[in-house]
Amino acid sequence: MGQQLSWEEAEAAGEMDVAELQEWYKKFVVECPSGTLFMHEFKRFFKVTGNEEASQYVESMFRAFDKNGDNTIDFLEYVAALNLVLRGSLEHKLKWTFKIYDKDRNGCIDRLELLDIVEAIYKLKKACRAELDLEHQGQLLTPEEVVDRIFLLVDENGDGQLSLTEFIEGARRDKWVMKMLQMDINPGCWITQQRRRSAMF
């Protein structure tokens, strides 16, 4: 009890090692000598200029990464966010995803907030058509149908809003809900492509 993990155990658990952290820092300093990353730079790194759907998704990601709400991402916020997205536990990813959906930061997700993100994710996934085809052989639901079904399965008190507890428990309880939410938790094809194209990553 209370023992610290060795580097090998930390790596096995999916945590970053010092060499990886140093590499990320070097890239961050080269791209952001001021020590902060602004929205327009964040979009540039993800190659979303001129792509409205991707831009909307990346703006939501930026707001979730910007923990202190100062409209910039510093190195610690950047590392924490990327480590979470790429390696975090399911519960941590769900909490982070909830923040992306909760645009007005009122602690609940309404239908419009959920629909906005689901629509953006659907459009992003079209860039990874092979992934969509593999995931959704057969009938593909519309974003509106996805939102209706999620609310039917997850909104336990029927108030038209999803609390963090409803969001997490609903995802854990229902495999379909989890799969739909994982479209945001881990947009694997898209985020991997963007990381490879970007000098930042």
Curated annotation (Swiss-Prot):
Deletion phenotype: Guca1a and Guca1b double knockout mice show an increase in response to light in dark-adapted cone photoreceptors. Dark-adapted cone photoreceptors show a delayed response time and a delayed recovery time in response to light. Guca1a, Guca1b and Rcvrn triple knockout mice show rod photoreceptors have a reduced current decay during light response.
Modifications made to the protein after synthesis: The N-terminus is blocked.
Residues where Ca(2+) 1 binds: D66, N68, D70, T72, E77
Biological processes, Gene Ontology terms: phototransduction; visual perception
Domain of life where this protein originates: Eukaryota
Location relative to the cell: Cell membrane; Photoreceptor inner segment; Cell projection, Cilium, Photoreceptor outer segment
Residues noted as binding Ca(2+) 2 in the record, renumbered to the chain: D102, D104, N106, C108, E113
Function of the molecule: Stimulates two retinal guanylyl cyclase (GCs) GUCY2E and GUCY2F when free calcium ions concentration is low, and inhibits GUCY2E and GUCY2F when free calcium ions concentration is elevated. This Ca(2+)-sensitive regulation of GCs is a key event in recovery of the dark state of rod photoreceptors following light exposure. May be involved in cone photoreceptor response and recovery of response in bright light.
Keyword Hydrolase: no
Tissue expr: Expressed in rod photoreceptors in the retina (at protein level). Expressed in cone photoreceptor cells.
Membrane topology: Lipid-anchor
GO cellular component terms, semicolon-separated: ciliary basal body; cone photoreceptor outer segment; nuclear membrane; nucleoplasm; photoreceptor inner segment; photoreceptor outer segment; plasma membrane
Entry protein name: Guanylyl cyclase-activating protein 2
Disulfide bond positions: none
Miscellaneous section: Binds three calcium ions.
Positions that bind Ca(2+) 3: D155, N157, D159, Q161, E166
Lipid-modified sites (N-myristoyl glycine): G2
Any Pfam family: EF-hand_1
InterPro entries: EF-hand-dom_pair (IPR011992), EF_Hand_1_Ca_BS (IPR018247), EF_hand_dom (IPR002048), Recoverin (IPR028846)
GO molecular function: calcium ion binding; calcium sensitive guanylate cyclase activator activity; guanylate cyclase regulator activity
